[in-house]
Every structure is written in C-alpha cells, then in structure tokens.
Amino acid sequence: MDQHLHIAQQPLLSGTPQEDGFAGPSVEFDRIESSLRSIQKFVPTDYASYTQEHYQFAGKKIIIQESIENYGTVVWPGATALCQYLEDHTEELNLQDAKILEIGAGAGLVSIVSSLLGAQVTATDLPDVLGNLQYNILKNTLECTAHLPEVRELVWGEDLEQSFPKSTCCYDYVLASDVVYHHYFLDKLLATMVYLSQPGTVVLWANKFRFSADYEFLGKFKQAFDTTLLAEYSESSVKLFKGILKWE
C-alpha cells in the first residue's frame, strides 16, 4: 500500500471554489451551495499541524487535507486497506450504483474511493469533522463521479430512527475503518451497525488491531453478524471483515 501514500506539508487551502479546482461555470451552483459553505467550518487552530496526503486509487490522484489535532481528520491504516480491497474487488462487490453508508468517515478517503468506483455514497461522522470531510469529498469527486456523495452527521446510537429511517435509508454496504480503538462508545457503534443493516446489507469493517478492546469488540461483532475474515495485512496489523446481520 506504500505506493498509494505520499505526505507533503502544505499551507491551508483558502481560495475560492474555482481557485481550488472545485468547479467551473458549468456546475449548477445551487446544487452544491450549502456544501461549499460547510467547508469553512473546519479551521485548524495550529496551521503547522496542517498537511496534505496524496493517494492513487480508481485511476485518480486523491488529495486529502488533514490536521493531527483531531483523530477524525487523519487517514488511518484501515482506511487505505479498505480502499485497496474495494478497488481490487469492484466488480465482485458490484459497486456501480450501489448504495453505501460509511460510519466514521473521518477525512473521507474511503467515501471518495467508493464514489469514484461508481457507488452512491453517504459519508457520516461527528459534527466537528464534517467541514473537513465535506471539503475533501468535494475537492476529489465534484464533476468526476456519477453520484456526488452526501455528507451527514451521525452520532453513534443517537436519533437513528429519526435521522436514518429504515423505510427510506436502505444500504447495500455499510463501511467502517479504524472506528474501534480506545473509546467508550463501542456498544453504541455496534448498535449503529446493527441498526443500519437490513436484509441484503453487507458490513465491511477494516481495523488495525492494537488493544484488547479491539478483540473484545470483534467478539461482540461476531455475535451479531455472520462474520468472514476477507483480508489480513500483517505489515499494518489491519484485518478486514465482512459481516451480515444474523436474523432471528
């Protein structure tokens, strides 16, 4: 996966949408007006911590802006592993026009790659990282994907029925990468995965396994989902699992 990653220090991107390469006059502004406004929400307090990372997936150079100030604005090993798997198995997974929701989308790499591969993507995360997430998604998908990804707030375990009603929110895939680490919301994370899974939904979860809590979560995941280990990356300690909800 090293060939997909290059890190370079960059100044904060602060130009207008056209200066930053977002769009030309042919784009319908009203379609993306609120999205463009939302990119202003993310402003690192320490500009020295600001970086760009460059990736190559789906035949396109992808530029991700990050800040090390927030766990959710950094690309982690599970994300690159999941992107590689999606790219290598696009036809097998039937990603063209597939409906995908990503939990904990972070800096947006997985959602961007999924969109470039033809999927209809909903990228979700906590409110404090949505501005950066939206920025990266627009920067890398506008005018070059069939379906412009949607960015939405999702707090694990909260207001799920109200925000994502099962009657209208049906997904072929729920994606998650490096969402399991040392935090206190693992039960809510699992409950969210279960809630978003309907008959036919496949969960693809990639994670670097570091702590005992990671394996404890895996045990609970296996209780809720029929689980298959799809890939293991020894150099990064990342495991990629496929889960299909067990129905009583």
Swiss-Prot record:
Specifically expressed in skeletal muscle. One of its GO terms (cellular component) is nucleus. GO terms for molecular function: heat shock protein binding; protein-lysine N-methyltransferase activity. It is an enzyme of class 2 (transferase). S-adenosyl-L-methionine binds at residues 76, 104-106, 125, 156. Keywords: Cytoplasm, Methyltransferase, Nucleus, S-adenosyl-L-methionine, Transferase. It is found in: Nucleus; Cytoplasm. Protein-lysine N-methyltransferase using S-adenosyl-L-methionine as methyl donor. Mono-di and trimethylates 'Lys-943' of AARS1. Interacts with members of the heat shock protein 70 families; these proteins may possibly be methylation substrates for the enzyme. This is Protein-lysine methyltransferase METTL21C. It comes from Mus musculus (Mouse). The lineage of its organism: Eukaryota, Metazoa, Chordata, Craniata, Vertebrata. The gene is Mettl21c.
